[in-house]
Curated annotation (Swiss-Prot):
Annotated Pfam families: PSI_PsaH
Organism: Pisum sativum
Superkingdom classification of source: Eukaryota
Gene responsible for this protein: PSAH
Keyword Membrane: yes
Protein name: Photosystem I reaction center subunit VI
Length: 36
């Protein structure tokens, strides 16, 4: 795992991953969940 939160976007921790979403410019975890 690469820092967990950096790679895995948990719905429970979506508050913490919000910053990550900005980097991707996406609000939906769908495309990224598929990659994971």
């Amino acid at each position: 795992k690469y820092g967990d939160k950096s790679v895995y976007f948990d719905l429970e921790d979506i508050g913490n991953t919000t910053g990550q979403w900005d980097l991707y410019g996406s609000d939906a975890p769908s495309p990224y969940s598929x990659l994971q």
